[in-house]
């Protein structure tokens, strides 16, 4: 990619919508990616000339020459409505809405529920004892003749394994990058790292090849990464020990015992539940106060107070990828890192599932070594005292829970088994009904006391890992409570003031500018985010202006030397949005969610400070890179190819929403806008914008070959599953 002239994205914030004056190819020739700043003219709707249509709210303003009059595409409003559950699912796709629980409400009949992805397996598998050994010197199979897998390598390759893929130039991308393929003869591109050699008895033996030079270049860049370049890998022995309750959580046990005693004492002291209805005598009150003091004395300080934890930093130059369920998988995060994303998070993991040792939940903690590197920050960044960039990471974990002990014990296990985490974030924003009904996610917004207990306990057991929290404006549209909640998160609630135990010690707060009720039906409320940013700034700089000296936090209990970072989240879709939020909302950084799924190069735009009109060829190369990362993560055997195809299709169900900016009449683009039927500047661009899931499968086959006969894919929405019409 040719170099881009770097422009400080914080210098100018456009105040008006702009008419897109970019030159656009009107024929079918490929439109090159624009690396120069798109020339734009500030106008108002009244100043529109030359018959250009006015911008209609909710509809992408596509230039007339790219509009298609008749198409099987869904209309903008319909497509917008049906895409809402997909956006919700990006926050918690593992917890689908339960049927029959929506009493008095209209069912979302456009959704495909209980989707089946079929299977992608060999007709008969190759025995593991043969998968990596030379043909004539295999390892011993412990099952012998009773083994249900194939033992003859040539028979397996000829009869049970599908033919090799011809994509990627016929070369296995894992072997090409690392000099060895961990899938041996089962690899769908095994021909690139397999050969025959002559033996002393005149036979020809199949063997696997390794490239020492490639292996040397592929050595991990961080010392604690695995041979495959992964960090935070939890061994099977550790997961089994957790599942069988053989792994103890001593810090959590001590803290939870103290919390239980403290809660009972506070309940008596604050609510007088130990008193009879006739009133209370002074002796009883004094006894209760003595009990509170006794609990204070019994409290054992955690090994690391918040002020003793690793310092972190968020700034304008650190755009952050939001935690995304399903979409936020490891290959996608790697892709975003390549485009300039500075911080990533795991998919949301349920605390109880981690405590139970569920393999699928612990697998979410795996990160690529590129996520274990320090973030790139400005040399003039206003970092907090004690911040050491060389000890910082890009990857953090997000967990959810409905009880304090779930979150606290899960945090202690994470800090012990996956120490290479930047932060552990508590999800208080997930809107999915099942998560909400269980009391987790956004349900915690209505229970601030419980939330504070969870965060305080997480801080007590997380060792050096800072604790952060992600919230919404509230659970209902007409009653936002984020300002009150933020004050509690920074200063501590009334109970903490009585016990004189300081604030809960969160290092950062992220606010999604929507309520739980709102979901994605309206634009994020950045004016409210700005109000909360101003509040946090006041709390950080002038705590004595908003509280009395009795509630002034103990300096020992403050994370980051007393600074709580604040991130805004919602509808960031371009460098224009990012700059506007940094300059006008006053947030430290912006967390990008759907905007990054639809166009991962939004991080590159933020870094360059300009729109980038990616050509269809460049976007296809991006999808190819995702395919390579997918095979590296899930495997290059039949099962791994099928898994990569499934997650690529899930991703393409978002990327098709992208309308190239060269086709737009006005800038900036809005993430909520849905386009009328349109055609691209060439056939490939049109294909990439197709809402038909069969076209998405066609795109995956460009890199992963024809789908397995048993593979299935049902799009999230029935509106995407139509037959092409002539």
Swiss-Prot record:
FMN binds at residues 323-325, 398, 470, 512, 569-571, 593-594. Residues 28-38, 94-103, 113-124 have a biased composition (Basic and acidic residues). It catalyses: 5,6-dihydrouridine(47) in tRNA + NAD(+) = uridine(47) in tRNA + NADH + H(+); 5,6-dihydrouridine(47) in tRNA + NADP(+) = uridine(47) in tRNA + NADPH + H(+); a 5,6-dihydrouridine in mRNA + NAD(+) = a uridine in mRNA + NADH + H(+); a 5,6-dihydrouridine in mRNA + NADP(+) = a uridine in mRNA + NADPH + H(+). Residues 78-87 have a biased composition (Low complexity). Residues 1-10 have a biased composition (Polar residues). Keywords: Cytoplasm, Flavoprotein, FMN, Metal-binding, mRNA processing, NAD, NADP, Nucleus, Oxidoreductase, Repeat, tRNA processing, Zinc, Zinc-finger. GO terms for cellular component: cytoplasm; nuclear periphery. A zinc finger (C3H1-type) spans 121-154, 171-196. GO terms for molecular function: flavin adenine dinucleotide binding; mRNA dihydrouridine synthase activity; tRNA dihydrouridine synthase activity; tRNA-dihydrouridine47 synthase activity; zinc ion binding. Its EC number is 1.3.1.89, 1.3.1.-. This is tRNA-dihydrouridine(47) synthase [NAD(P)(+)].
């Amino acid at each position: 990619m040719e170099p881009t002239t770097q422009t400080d994205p914080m210098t100018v914030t456009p105040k008006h919508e702009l008419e897109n004056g970019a030159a656009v190819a009107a024929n079918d020739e490929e439109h090159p990616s624009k690396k120069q700043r798109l020339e734009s003219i500030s106008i108002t709707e009244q100043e529109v000339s030359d018959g250009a249509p006015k911008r209609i709210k909710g509809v992408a303003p596509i230039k007339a020459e790219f509009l298609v009059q008749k198409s099987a595409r869904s209309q903008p409003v319909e497509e917008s409505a049906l895409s809402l559950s997909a956006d919700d699912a990006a926050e918690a796709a593992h917890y689908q809405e339960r049927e029959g629980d929506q009493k008095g409400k209209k069912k979302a009949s456009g959704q495909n529920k209980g989707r089946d992805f079929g299977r992608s397996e060999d007709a008969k598998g190759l025995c593991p004892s043969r998968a990596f050994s030379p043909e004539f010197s295999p390892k011993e199979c412990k099952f012998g003749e009773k083994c249900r897998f194939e033992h003859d390598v040539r028979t397996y390759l000829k009869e049970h394994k599908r033919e090799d893929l011809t994509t990627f130039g016929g070369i296995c991308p894992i072997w090409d990058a690392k000099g060895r393929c961990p899938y041996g003869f089962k690899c769908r591109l095994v021909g690139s790292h397999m050969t025959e050699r002559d033996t002393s008895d005149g036979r020809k033996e199949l063997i696997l090849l390794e490239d020492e030079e490639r292996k040397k270049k592929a050595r991990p860049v961080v010392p604690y990464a695995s041979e495959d370049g992964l960090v935070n890998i939890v061994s099977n022995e550790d997961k089994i020990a957790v599942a069988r309750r053989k792994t103890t959580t001593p810090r959590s046990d001590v803290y939870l015992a103290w919390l239980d005693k403290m809660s009972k004492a506070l309940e008596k002291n604050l609510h007088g539940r130990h008193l009879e209805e006739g009133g209370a005598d002074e002796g009883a009150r004094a006894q209760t106060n003595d009990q509170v003091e006794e609990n204070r004395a019994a409290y054992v300080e955690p090994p690391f107070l918040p002020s003793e934890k690793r310092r972190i930093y968020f700034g304008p130059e650190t755009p952050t990828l939001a935690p995304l369920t399903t979409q936020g998988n490891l290959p996608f995060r790697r892709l975003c890192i390549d485009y300039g994303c500075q911080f990533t998070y795991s998919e949301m993991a349920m605390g109880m599932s981690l405590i139970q040792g569920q393999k699928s939940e612990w697998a979410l903690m795996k990160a690529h070594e590129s996520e274990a590197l320090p973030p790139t920050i400005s040399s003039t960044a206003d970092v907090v005292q004690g911040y050491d960039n060389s000890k910082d990471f890009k990857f953090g974990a997000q967990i959810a829970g409905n009880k304090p002990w779930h979150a606290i014990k899960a945090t202690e296990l994470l800090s012990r088994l996956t120490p290479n985490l930047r932060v552990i974030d508590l999800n208080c924003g997930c809107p999915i009904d099942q998560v909400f009904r269980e009391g987790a996610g956004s349900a915690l917004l209505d229970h601030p006391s419980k939330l504070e207990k969870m965060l305080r306990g997480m801080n007590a057991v997380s060792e050096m890992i800072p604790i952060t929290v992600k919230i919404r404006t509230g659970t209902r549209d007409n009653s936002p409570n984020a300002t009150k909640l933020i004050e509690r998160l920074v200063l501590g609630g009334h109970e903490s003031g009585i016990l004189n135990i300081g604030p809960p010690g969160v290092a950062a707060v992220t606010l999604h500018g929507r309520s739980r009720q709102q979901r994605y039906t309206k634009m994020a409320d950045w004016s409210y985010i700005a109000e909360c940013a101003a509040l946090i700034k006041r709390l950080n700089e002038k705590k004595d202006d908003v509280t009395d000296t009795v509630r002034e936090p103990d300096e020992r209990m403050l994370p980051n030397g007393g600074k709580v970072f604040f991130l805004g989240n919602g509808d960031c879709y371009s460098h224009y949005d990012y700059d506007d939020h940094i300059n006008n909302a006053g947030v430290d950084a912006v967390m990008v969610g759907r905007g990054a799924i639809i166009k991962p190069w939004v991080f590159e735009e933020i870094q360059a400070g300009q729109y980038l009109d990616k050509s269809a060829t460049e976007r296809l190369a991006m999808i190819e890179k995702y395919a390579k990362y997918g095979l590296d993560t899930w495997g290059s055997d039949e099962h791994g190819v099928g898994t990569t195809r499934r997650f690529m299709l899930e991703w393409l169900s978002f990327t098709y929403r992208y309308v190239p900016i060269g086709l737009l009449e006005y800038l900036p683009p809005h993430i909520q806008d849905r386009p009328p039927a349109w055609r691209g500047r060439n056939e490939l661009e049109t294909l990439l914008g197709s809402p038909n899931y069969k076209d998405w499968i066609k795109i995956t086959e460009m890199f992963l070959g024809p789908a397995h006969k048993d593979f299935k894919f049902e799009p999230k929405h029935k509106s995407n599953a139509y037959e092409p019409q002539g």
